[in-house]
């Protein structure tokens, strides 16, 4: 699976990038038909504490799954986004098995 990591207006350090890849690769254990993923990191509205935004798009057969979460840290936002995607993947996997 190909994992693309992009950031808006800042550079991602290697520690955060490796954490992102690790979390996304764990999703492929749950559902093996993930073709690729795009992760976008943003700093949104710098006047608030919860200004770190993580958007994750998983390309799978049929539809794409998407999650966007905002938090105090990128790590926390990434955790929330991957948790949401786990739920979406489980739901999608159930639909595929019914067909």
Where are these regions (language model features)?
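N-terminal, polar/charged subdomain of small-to-medium soluble alpha/beta proteins
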Residues: 1-99
């Amino acid at each position: 699976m190909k994992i693309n990591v992009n950031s808006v207006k800042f550079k991602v350090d290697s520690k955060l990038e490796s954490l992102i890849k690790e979390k996304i690769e764990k999703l492929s254990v749950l559902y093996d038909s993930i073709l690729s993923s795009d992760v976008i990191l943003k700093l949104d509205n710098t006047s608030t504490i919860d200004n770190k935004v993580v958007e994750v798009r998983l390309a799978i057969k049929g539809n794409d799954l998407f999650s966007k979460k905002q938090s105090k840290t990128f790590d926390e936002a990434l955790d929330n986004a991957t948790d949401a995607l786990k739920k979406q993947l489980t739901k999608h996997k159930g639909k595929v098995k019914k067909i």
